[in-house]
Curated annotation (Swiss-Prot):
One of its GO terms (biological process) is segmentation. It comes from Drosophila virilis (Fruit fly). The modification Phosphothreonine is found at T199. Residues 219-229 have a biased composition (Basic and acidic residues). Gap class segmentation protein that controls development of head structures. GO terms for cellular component: nucleus. This is Protein hunchback. Keywords: Developmental protein, DNA-binding, Gap protein, Metal-binding, Nucleus, Phosphoprotein, Repeat, Zinc, Zinc-finger. A zinc finger (C2H2-type) spans 261-283, 290-312, 318-340, 346-364, 763-785, 791-815. Residues 49-60, 79-89, 129-139, 399-427, 536-560, 712-734 have a biased composition (Low complexity).
Length: 816
């Protein structure tokens, strides 16, 4: 500071102002702006000396003249050029990165201006670089996430992620002496130049703090996923070890969703297991509380505590036989085994939802208000005795109570037609929605008739054939072809299932299975010998030709009928077409007409003793009481009139045809599923014994005792989706035949001896050539035959070598 007391005033104000301006320009603009930190003391000293000199001797030296503006501008431009040259030098760049001022380039001995502060900053930067490289090297060895150095964003008080690297190595750097400044600073500059490329700039954000280990977080998530479909026995346990971190902190699954623990008594939701256990204790009686000795777990059930203690001890005695999965109880193992199965036991009746777990199925039904479909067993067979209690607390499906089965059978026989039709119409939506569950356990009752077509290419068109009313020509053609057909490839399982009315198998034969049925028939035909396939193809061609011939003959005969017959025919055909269309729309499944029935002995004797057409026409006339009492629609009550007209047409055509055709005509008049004779006999049988399941279709399986009888069972799948069974029996061993109505899915069979009514039923497995006297044993045996390969076990999927290999496999291996 100048001494204002000793200094004298300027000669004039203008001279003093000019002197002050020149002094300000000389002292400020000649010094770099970035160097004011380190040269502040020097500038202050210079200003002080200049002030003192100017103040002490104003008279000895005259005041400097004002510097022209042009001279000041030139000096300012020169200083700017010097600053640009200084920034290009590595020395200045290193100092700028370390946030230290660059020395002035005007002096040649600029290194002398570096003091101990600059040297200390350079050494600290080198040490930071060494620690950074060491951290990266250790990170690569332990396979951790990318760890960074010091994070300036870390709040104070929190542990530094790099503290274990800096804690032991951070020492106060020695202060270099000013005497060794040239040598030490030169070495530091060379080292800084080499490390400049690897040193991160100070304005770049360091790496973030290390995240939590993925391995530690993945284990509880995996355990939580495994417990998602387990039973209620493990509802209090979700992790392998109930340590403090798992029971006192919220748990997140792999999708980032926090797990909640909901009380089933009051609905309170907790986010930690400790809070959930504390709340659960309030609902328990004090004398029944069981508490774990290692954690706050509480329960009222002894087996729950036992499972929990096994988790603490890491004891998992139950192990899967197909993988390395282990668990603490049998319920968890049963839930896990479903993951290895391809059978979806629970299906929705209102949508395509299917699942393996009953709990998930109940949640779906509650959420959308849907109705459950048919429950399947573990092997895929439909089990109508199991029902789903949607809003109940019972685990798994429950069985129906059969206490009132006798009264229900007696009431069924007395039910009126309207009530029966209404009951079946209510069951139709459930029946039509069952998709692809039928063929998981039972093979389809297909046959080697014309619908099989010998190959997949010809079977598929037959499966989608248009619906057409039954005509006499087609019936005659099928009857003529029946004696030459080979025996059935698959047993008539439909008639077997109809014996037990509790096995609601027919709802599965609907439009959804048409393509699958054609593929199943093609797969069966592919296993036959080439000679058998050629024979079937030839028979199909012959049948097609005969059908065309019969249609031509039918057209010629209709033109020769009298006028009154034509009028009656038109009226009856219109009624039949209306009824047939109404049935195809209203009734997707007619089970009442599919019951196999027995012919009365009197009717059999009349058909044998009356060869003439007039007597046969008289015996086939209908009465009012011959119509079926149980039907699904009004169409089946008028089927008798149509049959009478068809019978008259067949008899007239037989009178004009050759004697060979006359011999074949009586077989075509046999009662079928749509005939009133079959319906009347079915009603009589139901009235006599409504709860019995015996039928002539079961007795028609006696192919082993009567080898000379040809049995044909044809199955066709059409777009109508109707399902019916047709069976006929006669005492003539050479005239046994079956008629499959076109446009329906039918399975028919015929018996062949006069003593068939008293003989027991015998069931034959065509694959293994074995006969069964019990329907249950036969059903169990057929459940082991797979759909795609008959000698592959349907339970476990193992392929066997022929029937012997399959039986050995069934005997040696346990199937659950």
């Amino acid at each position: 500071m100048p001494n204002w007391e000793t200094s004298t005033a300027a000669p004039s104000y203008e001279q003093h102002n000019a002197w002050y301006s020149s002094m300000f320009a000389a002292n400020i603009k000649q010094e770099p702006l970035s160097h004011h930190h380190h040269h502040h003391g020097q500038q202050h000293h210079d200003n002080h000396s200049n002030s003192n000199s100017g103040a002490s001797s104003p008279r000895q030296s005259p005041l400097p003249s004002p510097i022209p503006p042009s001279t000041q501008l030139e000096q300012y431009l020169k200083q700017q050029q010097q600053q640009q040259q200084q920034q290009q030098q590595p020395m200045d760049t290193l100092c700028a990165a370390a946030m230290t001022p660059s020395p002035s380039n005007n002096d040649q001995n600029s290194l002398q201006h570096f003091d101990a502060t600059l040297q200390q900053q350079l050494l600290q930067q080198q040490q930071y670089q060494q620690h950074f490289q060491a951290a990266q090297h250790q990170q690569q060895q332990h396979h951790h996430l990318a760890l960074g150095g010091f994070n300036p964003l870390t709040p104070p008080g929190l542990p530094n992620p790099m503290q274990h690297y800096y804690g032991g190595n951070m020492r106060p750097s020695p202060q270099p002496t000013p005497t060794a400044a040239p040598t030490a600073v030169a070495a530091a500059i060379q080292t800084g130049d080499k490390l400049q490329a690897l040193t991160p700039p100070m304005d770049v954000t360091p790496p973030k703090s290390p995240a939590k280990s993925q391995q530690s977080s993945a284990e509880p998530e995996k355990e939580h996923d495994l417990m998602s479909n387990s039973s209620e026995d493990m509802k209090y346990m979700a992790e392998s070890e109930d340590d403090d971190s798992n029971i006192r902190m919220p748990i997140y699954n792999s999708h980032g969703k926090m797990k909640n623990y909901k009380c089933k008594t009051c609905g309170v939701v907790a986010i930690t297991k400790v809070d959930f256990w504390a709340h659960t204790r309030t609902h328990m009686k004090p004398d029944k509380i069981l508490q774990c000795a290692k954690c706050p777990f509480v329960t009222e059930f002894k087996h729950h505590l036992e499972y929990h203690i096994r988790k603490h001890k890491n004891q998992k005695p139950f192990q899967c036989d197909k993988c390395s999965y282990t668990c603490v109880n049998k319920s968890m193992l049963n839930s896990h085994r479903k993951s290895h199965s391809s059978v979806y036991q629970y299906r929705c009746a209102d949508c395509d939802y299917a699942t393996k777990y009953c709990h998930s199925f109940k949640l779906h039904l509650r959420k959308y208000g849907h109705k459950p479909g048919m429950v399947l067993d573990e092997d895929g067979t439909p089990n109508p005795s199991l029902v789903i209690d949607v809003y109940g607390t019972r685990r798994g499906p429950k069985s129906k109570s059969f206490s009132g089965s006798g009264s229900s059978c007696s009431s069924t026989s007395k039910r009126s037609n309207a009530s029966a039709a209404a009951a079946q119409q209510q069951q139709q939506p459930v029946a039509t929605s069952q998709l692809s569950a039928a063929l998981q356990g039972f093979p389809m009752p297909a046959a080697a008739a014309g619908t099989a077509a010998g190959a997949a290419g010809t079977a598929a068109p037959a499966a989608v054939a248009p619906v057409s009313p039954p005509s006499p020509a087609k019936s005659v053609a099928s009857v003529e072809q029946a004696p030459s057909l080979p025996s059935a490839l698959l047993p008539p399982l439909a008639s077997l299932l109809q014996q037990n009315r509790n096995m609601a198998f027919f709802p599965y034969w609907n439009l959804n299975l048409q393509v699958l049925a054609a593929q199943q028939q093609a797969a069966v035909l592919a296993q036959l010998s080439p000679r058998m396939r050629d024979q079937l193809q030839q028979q199909q061609q012959q049948q097609h030709q005969q059908q065309q011939q019969q249609q031509q003959q039918q057209q010629q005969q209709q033109q020769q009928l009298p006028a009154h017959s034509e009028n009656e025919e038109d009226e009856e055909e219109e009624e039949h077409e209306d009824d047939f269309e109404r049935k195809s729309v209203d009734s997707a499944m007619d089970l009442s007409q599919g019951t196999p029935v027995k012919e009365e002995p009197q009717q059999q004797q009349q058909q044998q003793q009356l060869p003439h057409s007039n007597h046969m026409a008289i015996n086939l006339k209908l009465k009012d009481e011959d119509t079926p009492l149980i039907s699904s629609s009004s169409a089946s009550r008028r089927k008798g009139r149509v049959l009478k007209l068809d019978t008259l047409l067949q008899l007239k055509s037989a009178a004009m045809s050759s004697p060979e055709q006359q011999l074949k005509l009586p077989a075509s008049v046999l009662p079928t599923a749509s005939s009133p004779i079959a319906g009347s006999s079915a009603n009589k049988q139901l009235a006599d014994d409504p709860c019995s399941g015996a039928s002539s279709a079961d007795e028609s399986m006696e192919t082993g005792r009567v080898p000379q009888v040809n049995i044909s069972a044809s199955s066709t799948a059409s777009s109508s989706g109707n399902s019916s069974n047709a069976s006929s029996s006669t005492s003539n061993p050479t005239a046994a035949a079956t008629v499959a109505t076109s446009g329906t899915v039918s399975s028919s069979s015929s018996s062949s001896t006069t003593t068939s009514s008293s003989a027991p039923a015998i069931y034959e497995c065509k694959y293994c050539d074995i006969y069964f006297k019990d329907a249950v044993l036969y059903t169990i045996h057929m459940g082991y035959h797979s759909c795609d390969d008959v000698f592959k076990c349907n339970m476990c999927g193992e392929k066997c070598d022929g029937p012997v290999g399959l039986f050995v496999h069934m005997a040696r291996n346990a199937h659950s």
